[in-house]
Each structure stands twice: as structure tokens, then as C-alpha cells.
Amino acid sequence: MADRSKGFMRAEFVTYAYILLYIALSSGQIFFNKWVLSSKEINFPYPLGLTLLHMIFSSVLCFLLTKVLKIVKVEEGMTLEIYVTSVIPIGAMFAMTLWLGNTAYLYISVAFAQMLKAIMPVAVFILGVAAGLEMMSCRMLLIMSIISFGVLVASYGELNINWIGVVYQMGGVVGEALRLIFMELLVKRKGIKLNPISLMYYVSPCSAICLFVPWIFLEKSKIDGNGPWNFHFVVLTLNSLCTFALNLSVFLVISHTSALTIRVAGVVKDWVVVLVSALLFADTKLTIINLFGYAIAIAGVAAYNNHKLKKEASKVVTTETPGDAESIPLVSQGNTNTER
């Protein structure tokens, strides 16, 4: 009995450790990206190049983990037809999301960017209805209205609003919503389930190619114009490694808990980012209106996640089989973008 109790406590400790690791890495990566892009010491104001570096690093590490070291097994079922019709669009939207989201940090504060991202469920719902994946209902309209109202109030309370940054951030939100829609279409039409490492194994190279083309035309000339490349490669490598570690932490949390846990942790992370950024960055000045509006939006997001999880749970009960805990569907309606 004592051994069983110790084993349970040990399992609980490990679970909470993974959750705290996810919150720390997710929050820290956002601050890390902001610092790399805006710091004069690092001198790397190239969001497209930073995102491209992340995807190349992720591609190499995923290849090493799955094909060389064989620590993680790549999920089977991927075909050329699925890759062309589903993975490439997902990779393109993923690249667009990270690129525009990182670019927004050059114009707006981390806290305000996080507040704007709360509108994500609204974009996903609207596109989902257009794609035939969501049904319009009074309850969902009420939830979407609450989220939208909260984001509007938070935006109204922003002291130093920069509309260029807002446009970039909203573009990132639309890209992420499209990515989630493509992923849900892939799940419903093909029935493919991948763990995060397998997902990044397939998506990262595609995203890297999608980013490389605009990088050649938009940023390479700027970098070359500043003289010989003399960047802090240790810092950039560490930044890329932290991004990959964040993706791995998502895998660990989901495999030891559930999708509900990662979403609750995501809400906690959002508040941590908003509050801590006010202490770390001089461009972040929170107001009572900011926080009040964001609280309203988060309440709407929580209601949305609860509604979606109940809907998903009713499906899982009849279809779940042993071993499913280590694979997650290629869809997440919450704000779980790991690199922004």
C-alpha cells in the first residue's frame, strides 16, 4: 500500500513538473524571441530569418531523433497524396503564422500581442463554419461575441497601439486558424493521428522551404547590406533549441495528462506572459482597461475550450483504444502555437 502511494505521488510530481516545464518554456520562448528580435546587443531584427532558423533546426533534430537515434517512431500512414494535399498547406500556414507573429513583436508589446491572440477561437470558428466543420448556434455566437468584446476592450485600453503590428498579429491569427482548419480536415478525411515529434518531422521541412523563398527576397539583402554576417550564433542556436524543447514539452504533457490539461496550462501561460512582460519590457504598459478586457476574452476562450472538449470527449469515449495516449489528433482549437 505504501509503495503504491509513493508511486502515485511520484507520478503526480512528474505530471506537475511537466506542466510547469511547459508553462516555463512556452512563456520563456515568447520572451526569448522578443529579446532576440528587439535587442541591440543581439542585433537580429529579422523575424523571417529567425523563424526559418527554427524550422531548419527542428527539421534536423526531428530527423536525428526519428531516423538516426530512433528514439521516437514516426507514425505510419503518410502518403505522397496526403503530404501534397494536406501537409504542405499546413506547413505553409504554420510558416505564415510564425513569421507574422514574430514580426508583430517589432511593433507591439508582448502583452498586447498576447491579448490580440485571444481572438483565435473566433477566427477558427468563422473559418470552420465556412468549411463545414462547425455548426452555427446561439451558444457559440454568444461565446464568440464575449471573446470579440473582450479583445476590443483590451485594444481600447492599449496606450501605444501600433496598427502595423496589429495587422501583422491578426495576419498571424488568420494563418493559425487556417492551419487548424487544414489539420482538422486532414483528421476527418484521412484519419491520421501524429504525435508532436512526428508532426514536426513532416511539417518543419515544408515550412522551412516556404520561409526560405520570401527570406531570399525580403531579408537576405538587408542582412548582406549590414556587412559581414556577425551574429550571436550561440544565442540563436539556444533560441532554436528552446523552441524544439517547447514542442517536446507539449508531447510530454499530453502523453501524461490530457488535451484539457494542456489547454488549462495554456490559459495560465497566457496570463503569465501578459503580467511578466510588464516587468521585463519597457514597451509594455498595462492598464486596468487592458486587463479587464483580456479577462473577458479569456473567460470566453475558457468557455469555448470547455465546449469543444466536451464535444471531443463524447467522440473519444466510443473510439479510444489502448496506446492512443501518445498520439494526438492534428487539430487543436485552443491557442497552442508553440513558438509565439
Curated annotation (Swiss-Prot):
Residues 330-340 have a biased composition (Polar residues). It is found in: Membrane. The keyword NAD does not apply. The chain crosses the membrane at residues 12-32, 44-64, 80-100, 110-130, 141-161, 163-183, 197-217, 234-254, 260-282, 286-305. One of its GO terms (cellular component) is cytosolic ribosome. It is a multi-pass membrane protein. InterPro entries: Sugar_P_trans_dom, TPT_transporter. Pfam families: TPT. Residues 320-340 are annotated as: Disordered. Keywords: Membrane, Sugar transport, Transmembrane, Transmembrane helix, Transport. Belongs to the TPT transporter family. TPT (TC 2.A.7.9) subfamily. This is Probable sugar phosphate/phosphate translocator At3g14410. The lineage of its organism: Eukaryota, Viridiplantae, Streptophyta, Embryophyta, Tracheophyta.
